[in-house]
A protein has these predicted regions:
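Conserved active-site segments centered on acidic
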Residues: 2-39
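Short glycine-rich, flexible loops that bind phosphorylated cofactors or substrates
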Residues: 13, 59-60
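Short, hydrophobic beta-strand segments that form beta-sheet elements in well-ordered domains
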Residues: 35, 48-54
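Short, polar loop motifs at secondary-structure junctions
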Residues: 40, 52-59
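A short, aliphatic-rich alpha-helical micro-motif
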Residues: 44-45
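Active-site regions of enzymes building and remodeling cell-envelope glycoconjugates
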Residues: 51, 63-71
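Ser/Thr/Gly-rich flexible loops in soluble cytosolic domains mediating phosphotransfer, phosphorylation
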Residues: 69-94
Length: 94
C-alpha cells in the first residue's frame, strides 16, 4: 500500500479535493493507497511514499522527496496525466 499525502496551502479545501481524486484514480488502477491531505507547513514533516501537489509548493520539500506535481487540484483528466505514470511506476505496473 502506498502512503500518499496531498498538499495545499491550508490543508482544507484543495488538498482534500485532490486526495479524493487520487483515491479514485488509484482505485480505478487497482492500486492500494492510504491517502491524506494536509497543509504545506505540516507536509514537510510527514512520512509518505509520495507527495502530490502543484508546482507552487514543490520547493518546500527536501531534495530526494518523491513528488508528483499536478496541473490541477480538481480536474481529474489533468491529474491523471501527471499521476497515473507515477502510480504505475511506484506499484510496479509500468
Amino acid at each position: 500500500m502506498l502512503k500518499i499525502v496531498t498538499v495545499c496551502g491550508n490543508g482544507i479545501g484543495s488538498s482534500l479535493l485532490l486526495r479524493m481524486k487520487v483515491e479514485a484514480i488509484a482505485k480505478d488502477l487497482g492500486i492500494a493507497v492510504d491517502a491524506e491531505s494536509c497543509d504545506s507547513n505540516a507536509a514537510v514533516g510527514k512520512g509518505a511514499d509520495l507527495f502530490v501537489t502543484v508546482k507552487e509548493f514543490k520547493d518546500i520539500f527536501p531534495e530526494g522527496t518523491k513528488l508528483c506535481i499536478v496541473k490541477s487540484y480538481t480536474n481529474r483528466k489533468k491529474i491523471e496525466e501527471d499521476l497515473v505514470p507515477v502510480l504505475k511506476e511506484m506499484s510496479g505496473q509500468d
